[in-house]
């Protein structure tokens, strides 16, 4: 298959082909971008698996998705025991796996394994899950990042500093940590592409970001603090300024199905400041391609999760 360096302008969900016989797994597809992507794939006759933390959330999402072949897998990314149990239940090959679930700008909290919540959920939980099921991924591993990665850093980039951040040591700044978690997604894709070539793994890693999209992600932090007024204001601003989740899902959908994409491609919206629009190939900030930082993050992630990709 010819490799492509561009996605046609105005590519949309209507360009998705029939996906009969294809299997997709999407984490965090009970709302927002993940739910929108799952809905479109199911409409094209794909067999879609979604992950959810509870049976109730899974069944509610499947009802929203509507007609189609949809199953669920219970998994809590904040609990590595749950991640391992979910991975052990993955006994089928998936054409595409989408690492989509996430939290944003939450109050300081730790996961069951002692990781800072945002980095533990957005990066470490996914790192572990994907590593445990890598032999079941056929074609693509899609990782949902954010343009907020531009706010992220890992200090002096050495392993001790990275480990401290992942463990929530030091001053907590919720937006900077969210940015670091989204930068971690991109560093993960960069290092995974290098390792894919070395190990001759069959699947291609691709990163995406949804721009500014109307999902409940922005309101979760307010909900955790019990700040009802702030939550209402956030949701009102989203309705006014953000693109709908169905539009925000387009980069993810393109990464899932558009043929010939290169490993470590990064796809986002083509509009002003990449906040909205149709999908296009783009570039992250330079730090996202720092090979030393990517290797250091990878090694620390393997150490903390006790999941080895080799």
Q: In which residue ranges do the predicted regions lie?
A:
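C-terminal amphipathic/interface module of NAD(P)-dependent oxidoreductases
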Residues: 285-310
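Rossmann-fold NAD(P)H-dependent dehydrogenase/reductase core
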Residues: 2-225, 304-309
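Residues at the start of alpha-helices and the adjacent loop-to-helix junctions
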Residues: 50-53, 79, 240, 247, ...
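C-terminal helical subdomain
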Residues: 3, 232-281, 291-295
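Short glycine/proline- and charge-enriched loop/turn segments
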Residues: 161-170, 227-233, 276-283
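Active-site rim elements
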Residues: 172-179, 236-242, 284-289
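Short glycine-enriched, charge-decorated loop/helix-capping segments at active-site entrances
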Residues: 113-115, 282-287
